[in-house]
């Protein structure tokens, strides 16, 4: 029985022909290559234990891993059921020494790192075997006579000298080769590992069978030093690995190393008990980072000094023993009850999970999980034990089809969406992909298997590999448009230089260990980084000379981020690596309280007020009480999808999903001011949104063959239609856009989409960019005219901040501005020739304290500790938490009033305990139980009343003026929570305005006789130009025609587009934040001018006109004075939002704050996120928000880890839905509006799962996705995970790091590293 897939048996099949062509038929027995016991990696519980085997497993912990073309990772792992005594003691494995072969005349046995014995028939010279269950190949060099099989296909990368050596055995797993040879002690040991590119890691052995040295693919040498740790006994010579020395950075190690010599670079050291058990691991600094305790050589405890501590109790202290209890210090205690085909695990919270199994020995598999709530998930396997189907608790099944070697060829989702791939029969390399929409991508490869051409719907991307030292690193990439990028690599296989399609060069320098120490951009601006010996980033010096420093505790958790001025954010950690406290430079502090399950149960904000969280049996958030007492409750279905949310007013919103778990509908409850409604969502097979329909509007999306959004049609309930149409180039960059009936806009771009021109009507805009592709000049001209309508110039500071700008109009207007920044990157002054110069001041938390304009009194601002605006000049002592809680009770009952207990006569309060500011700037505010502003009373008695629908969208308002007149307005929204119309009734006259949308950007205002179209700069919210046209209402016939074409996903034909009035073009001219301050016309004359204001953006207007855009993404509603800001409304007089952040605490601890109270530096175009434009104090404050989000999301996800193992295992097994997008130039443009559905449940359109944003973010925040820049040691990586949590958020929100990376994307376990895209 050969165990070979039928497609490789050839002449042994009848007639030498595979008549069925079936790739899943096997000849021989599935026992070939079968292990004596199943792998212990899945399932895992707790810290962790395998409930199927009862074994304690410590997954590999990396002690060091220095960058190399193929990085050598020195990792140790432990499995209690492994009886083998390694060089760290019984049950431990290390690279190189933990795998070996046993060859005899009758059999071949591969002993893996877990001590499992994988059995094969005898391996004669030249013979090969395949294990279907382990998915690996064995082949021996030489020939036993007869016709030898050629070393081609999967074996082509094996050097010729090994092909002919009978004393060489190759193990092929994925695309990695392990070369074994017989050592003097008679054991076949690992001599080298290598891949298709030829990078070799070599292992050197002593005559006693000790691994004494390793040479990695970068040429470094490592020396392993041993000691006599215990007395020799049967099967144990007592020798243990004392440590590993970095012996040489480039070259072989010295012939002799004295371990006692000073100055040796010990990468890791180990300490043992007198019984030979490992009791401590020391890092490169000599610090103890891991400790272990033993009884009769069985692990009974492990931990980290000052951190994790876990203890275990066993039924028997022997390798066949099983864990009966696991105790986490400060955490859960779990007990294990073993049955014949199941294990029940109960924890100290009284929850019981049941793991069910089938089969025996190496064929035993995990078949079902019954969770604490009774929900059941099931898993199916093929003959070789490979996962082929999953059924979730709702019975929804995902299936896979595999070929004879277990390679996945097709995946079918529960909704019957199919993804297919074709691989090369010999090498297993990807040849073709087909997605659920039947789009195909094909791959051409060179002799090494590198992808040289990828052809897809958008065209071809070509790759060249011209560096013989690094044959798998691309040196040239040509995109489908012909743009070419060049890449240079250093000896570690790290990117050294990148030349873009414009010839601009970015350079990267590394130290001897592959850590990025300096990077320079095409302007020569340099960024430097410093590291400690553990590879942790401790200093970052940016191009303008500003610097950030980082500190860590002994466990590698980040404890401090500070700027050059010493302004710091501090982090304190509790048990289980859970964040306990964060404090910023201004003294603001957030405290986190977790329960024994590691769930965040209380959060105390800077005002000493507490938010609380409750969870169900599965660790899902079921109740959340905010700082203001707003209580929200959540319900889920058996598949963990959110199905209902009950708000503080008792109203319930419900959610339904399709079979693929995508949001299908939302039922929004009725309120006093709006009826109940249902909003429905339809998806294409590949997961793109096809339509979103509600009571007032249906939005339909049409895509081109590549997947780019081609047409968005918004069909109102009364038949009115607005459509936006785009065309794209091969890179997915917009080339033309047509907004409704306005003239089309042609975009002229270069490279990956940098704008250098735009054509609209008879006007052309031209853009000049610097070497970093930042705009430095813009002008506009009419056809046939040499003179520019305007010229706009910009100069940038080293970090990209706007430093100077100048606008010159043909009509003579000349506007010049200069911007000043301090060492923290905060804007401290603006010099302006058209407006009074201004100076700004900030507190230590980065909040705007004052603005001083020439010739005017200073405007000053005060805040409580939580960032709520205060009135008055007096300072009050902080109230204690008890007083804050009592005050919060006002909101818990839904009661709100203007006075608070913190007020004193004649002054405002010292803080707003619930973050609901009730008085500011002479106005009084009242909120409902949900935190929505329902009334504003002005100093003159003017009264504004606001009313909301069940999705917390403003639908009605009345404004009673002091003179007794009244105004009334009503608003309508689509299913994406975009405002599509408003009707204003003033003095008995009703006016309706409709709005058209381009994704998240409002692009049109349609009045009864006028259409105004706003065109934004590509990819952002900064307005570029405006088109104004006279129009007439569509006749019924045209409306029907529009509806018919929209229903078919087609734009209205050009011959049917009504002739509107001549388009009048106006150009926006903005400040450093993208706020319009000037508007010029097509004659080069100034048409509108606004006066900048700290919180209002513009107030007043020097040349009044209809220009309602304020801060990016904001639209001034004249009828209310509010600014519509996509998902919320902004109160300009208060500098805050009128309702809470739909993202909840994910948007930060203060749900009303705008741009972190720094409107001179930051902006919020959607009312959800804050894309900060500077670093400095904001880095620290963004970190606080990141830590807050981490706490909530981690708390919600801890209970899902076990089921997630199967999903992760499933995903890691060549998931087509991941593969197809990771390594191909596919422009996966999401509809702008589909990132969130507004105040109902933001994020659910993209995840369709829970109230948190994404499981991937959870894994990142929990450290599972942590990486160091140079693949540094896992020990350092694990420590850096805490810093990574913080840094990722800071990098996203504060742009604190300017370096770029080329990212490698593995094709899962195919181990294919895709060229940078």
Swiss-Prot record:
<dbReference type="Pfam" id="PF20148">
    <property type="entry name" value="DUF6531"/>
</dbReference>
<comment type="function">
    <text>Toxin secreted by the H1 type VI (H1-T6SS) secretion system that acts on bacterial target cells. The producing bacterium is protected by a cognate immunity protein.</text>
</comment>
<dbReference type="InterPro" id="IPR006530">
    <property type="entry name" value="YD"/>
</dbReference>
<dbReference type="InterPro" id="IPR022385">
    <property type="entry name" value="Rhs_assc_core"/>
</dbReference>
<dbReference type="InterPro" id="IPR001826">
    <property type="entry name" value="RHS"/>
</dbReference>
<dbReference type="InterPro" id="IPR045351">
    <property type="entry name" value="DUF6531"/>
</dbReference>
<protein>
    <recommendedName>
        <fullName>Toxin protein Tse5</fullName>
    </recommendedName>
</protein>
<dbReference type="GO" id="GO:0097351">
    <property type="term" value="F:toxin sequestering activity"/>
</dbReference>
<feature type="region of interest" description="Disordered">
    <location>
        <begin position="395"/>
        <end position="419"/>
    </location>
</feature>
<feature type="compositionally biased region" description="Basic and acidic residues">
    <location>
        <begin position="403"/>
        <end position="415"/>
    </location>
</feature>
<dbReference type="GO" id="GO:0033103">
    <property type="term" value="P:protein secretion by the type VI secretion system"/>
</dbReference>
<keyword id="KW-0843">Virulence</keyword>
<dbReference type="InterPro" id="IPR031325">
    <property type="entry name" value="RHS_repeat"/>
</dbReference>
<dbReference type="Pfam" id="PF05593">
    <property type="entry name" value="RHS_repeat"/>
</dbReference>
<dbReference type="InterPro" id="IPR050708">
    <property type="entry name" value="T6SS_VgrG/RHS"/>
</dbReference>
<dbReference type="Pfam" id="PF03527">
    <property type="entry name" value="RHS"/>
</dbReference>
């Amino acid at each position: 029985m050969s165990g070979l897939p039928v497609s490789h048996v050839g002449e042994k099949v009848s007639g030498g022909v595979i008549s069925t062509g079936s790739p899943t038929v096997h000849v021989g027995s599935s026992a070939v290559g079968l292990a004596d016991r199943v792998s212990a990696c899945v399932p895992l519980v707790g810290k962790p234990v395998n409930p199927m085997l009862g074994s304690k497993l410590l997954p590999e912990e990396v002690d060091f891993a220095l960058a190399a073309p193929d990085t050598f990772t020195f990792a140790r792992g432990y499995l209690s059921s492994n009886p083998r005594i390694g060089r760290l003691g019984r049950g431990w494995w290390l690279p190189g020494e933990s795998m070996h072969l046993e060859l005899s005349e009758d059999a071949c046995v591969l002993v893996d790192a877990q001590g499992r014995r994988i059995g094969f028939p005898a391996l004669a010279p030249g013979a090969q075997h395949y294990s279907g269950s382990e998915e690996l190949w064995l082949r021996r060099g030489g020939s036993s006579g007869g016709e030898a099989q050629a070393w081609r296909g999967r074996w082509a990368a094996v050097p010729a000298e090994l092909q002919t050596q009978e004393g060489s055995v190759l193990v092929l797993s994925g695309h990695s080769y392990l070369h074994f040879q017989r050592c003097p002690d008679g054991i076949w040991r690992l001599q080298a590992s290598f891949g298709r590119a030829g990078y070799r890691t070599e292992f050197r052995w002593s005559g006693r069978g000790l691994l004494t040295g390793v040479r990695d693919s970068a040429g470094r040498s490592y020396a392993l030093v041993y000691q006599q740790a215990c007395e020799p006994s049967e099967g144990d010579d007592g020798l243990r690995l004392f440590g590993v020395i970095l012996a040489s950075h480039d070259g072989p190690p010295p012939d002799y190393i004295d371990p006692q010599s000073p100055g040796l670079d010990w990468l890791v050291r180990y300490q043992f008990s007198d019984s030979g058990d490992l009791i401590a691991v020391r890092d490169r600094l000599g610090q103890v980072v891991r400790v272990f305790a033993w009884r009769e050589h069985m692990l009974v405890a492990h931990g980290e000094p000052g951190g994790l501590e876990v203890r275990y109790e066993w039924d028997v202290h022997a390798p066949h023993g099983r864990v009966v209890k696991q105790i986490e210090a400060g955490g859960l205690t779990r007990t294990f009850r073993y049955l014949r085909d199941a294990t029940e695990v109960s924890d100290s919270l009284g929850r019981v999970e049941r793991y069910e199994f089938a089969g025996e020995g190496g064929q035993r598999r995990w078949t079902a999980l019954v969770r604490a709530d009774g929900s059941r998930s099931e898993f199916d396997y093929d003959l070789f034990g490979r996962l082929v189907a999953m059924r979730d608790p709702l019975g929804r099944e995902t299936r896979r089809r595999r070929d004879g070697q277990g390679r996945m060829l097709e995946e079918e989702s529960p909704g019957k969406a199919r993804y297919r791939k074709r691989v090369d029969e010999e090498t297993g390399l990807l040849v073709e992909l087909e997605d659920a929409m039947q789009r195909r991508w094909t791959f051409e490869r060179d002799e090494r298997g590198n992808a040289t051409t990828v052809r897809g719907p958008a065209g071809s991307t070509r790759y060249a590999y011209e560096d013989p030292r690094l044959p798998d690193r691309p040196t040239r990439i040509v995109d489908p448009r012909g743009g070419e990028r060049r890449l240079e690599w250093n000896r570690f296989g790290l990117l050294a230089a990148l030349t873009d399609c414009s010839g601009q060069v970015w350079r990267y320098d590394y130290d001897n260990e592959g850590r990025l120490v300096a990077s320079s951009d095409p302007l020569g601006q340099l960024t430097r980084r410093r590291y400690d010996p553990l590879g942790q980033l401790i200093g970052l010096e940016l191009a303008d000379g500003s610097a950030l420093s980082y500190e860590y505790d002994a466990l590698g958790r980040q404890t401090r981020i500070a700027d050059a001025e010493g302004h710091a954010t501090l982090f304190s950690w509790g048990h289980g690596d859970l964040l306990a406290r964060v404090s910023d430079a201004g003294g603001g502090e957030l405290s986190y309280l977790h329960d024994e399950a590691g769930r965040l149960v209380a959060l105390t904000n800077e005002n000493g007020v507490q938010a609380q969280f409750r969870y169900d049996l599965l660790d899902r958030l079921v109740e959340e009480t905010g700082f203001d007492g707003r209580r929200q409750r959540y319900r889920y279905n058996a598949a963990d999808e959110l199905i209902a949310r009950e708000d503080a007013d008792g109203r319930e919103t419900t959610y339904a999903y399709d079979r693929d778990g995508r949001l299908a509908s939302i039922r929004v409850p009725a309120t006093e001011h709006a009826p109940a409604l249902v909003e429905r969502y339809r998806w294409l097979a590949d997961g793109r949104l096809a339509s979103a329909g509600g009571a007032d509007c249906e939005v339909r999306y049409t895509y081109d063959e590549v997947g780019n959004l081609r047409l968005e049609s918004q069909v109102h309930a009364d038949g009115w239609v607005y459509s936006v149409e785009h065309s794209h180039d091969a890179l997915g960059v917009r080339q033309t856009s047509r907004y409704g009936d306005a003239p089309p806009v042609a975009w002229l771009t270069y490279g990956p989409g940098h704008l250098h021109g735009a054509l609209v009507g008879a006007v052309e805009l031209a853009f000049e960019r610097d070497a970093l592709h930042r705009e430095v000049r813009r002008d506009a001209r009419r056809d046939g005219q040499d003179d520019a309508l305007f010229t706009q110039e910009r100069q940038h500071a080293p970090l990209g901040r706007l430093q100077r700008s100048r606008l010159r109009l043909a009509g003579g207007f000349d506007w010049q501005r200069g911007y000043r920044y301090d060492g923290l990157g905060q804007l401290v002054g603006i010099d302006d020739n058209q407006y009074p110069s201004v100076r700004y001041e900030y507190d230590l938390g980065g909040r705007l304290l004052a603005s001083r304009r020439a010739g005017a009194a200073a405007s000053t601002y005060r805040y409580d500790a939580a960032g709520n605006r205060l009135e008055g000049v007096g300072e009050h002592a902080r109230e204690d938490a008890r007083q804050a809680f009592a005050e919060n009770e006002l909101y818990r009952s839904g009661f709100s009033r203007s006075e608070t207990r913190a007020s004193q006569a004649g002054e405002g309060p010292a803080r707003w305990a619930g973050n609901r500011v009730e008085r500011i700037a002479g106005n009084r505010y009242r909120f409902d139980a949900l935190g929505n502003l329902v009334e504003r009373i002005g100093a003159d008695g003017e009264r504004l009343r606001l009313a909301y629908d069940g999705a917390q969208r403003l639908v009605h308002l009345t404004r009673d003026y002091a003179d007794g007149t009244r105004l009334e307005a009503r608003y309508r929204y689509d299913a994406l929570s975009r405002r599509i119309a408003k009707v204003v009734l003033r003095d008995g006259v009703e006016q309706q305005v409709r709005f058209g949308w381009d994704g998240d950007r409002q692009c049109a205002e349609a009045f009864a006789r006028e259409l105004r179209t706003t065109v934004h700069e590509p990819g952002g919210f900064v307005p570029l130009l405006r088109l104004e046209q006279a129009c007439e209402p569509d006749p019924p016939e045209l409306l029907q025609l529009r509806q018919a074409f929209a229903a078919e996903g087609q734009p209205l034909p050009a011959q049917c587009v009504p002739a509107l009035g001549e388009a009048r073009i106006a150009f926006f001219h903005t400040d450093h934040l993208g706020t319009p301050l000037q508007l010029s016309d097509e004659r080069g004359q100034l048409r509108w001018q606004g006066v900048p204001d700290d919180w209002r953006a513009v107030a007043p207007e020097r040349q009044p006109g209809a220009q309602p855009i304020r801060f990016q993404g904001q639209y001034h509603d004249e009828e209310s004075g509010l600014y519509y800001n996509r998902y919320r409304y902004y109160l300009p007089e208060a500098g805050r939002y009128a309702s809470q952040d739909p993202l909840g605490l994910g948007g930060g601890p203060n749900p009303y704050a705008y741009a972190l109270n720094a409107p001179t530096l930051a902006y919020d175009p959607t009312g959800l996120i804050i894309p900060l434009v500077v670093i400095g104090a904001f880095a620290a404050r963004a970190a606080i928000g990141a830590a807050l989000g981490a706490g909530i999301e981690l708390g919600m996800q801890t209970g899902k880890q076990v089921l997630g193992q199967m999903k992760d295992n499933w995903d890691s097994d060549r998931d087509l839905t991941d593969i197809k997008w990771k390594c191909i130039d596919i422009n996966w443009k999401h509809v702008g509006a589909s990132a969130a559905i507004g105040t109902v449940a933001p994020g659910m359109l993209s995840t369709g799962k829970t109230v948190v944003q994404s499981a991937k973010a959870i894994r990142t925040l929990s450290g599972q996705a942590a990486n160091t820049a140079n693949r540094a040691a896992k020990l350092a990586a694990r420590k850096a995970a805490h810093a990574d949590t913080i840094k990722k958020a800071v990098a996203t929100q504060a742009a604190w790091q300017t370096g770029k990376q080329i990212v490698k994307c593995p094709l899962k376990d195919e181990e294919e590293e895709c060229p940078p895209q």
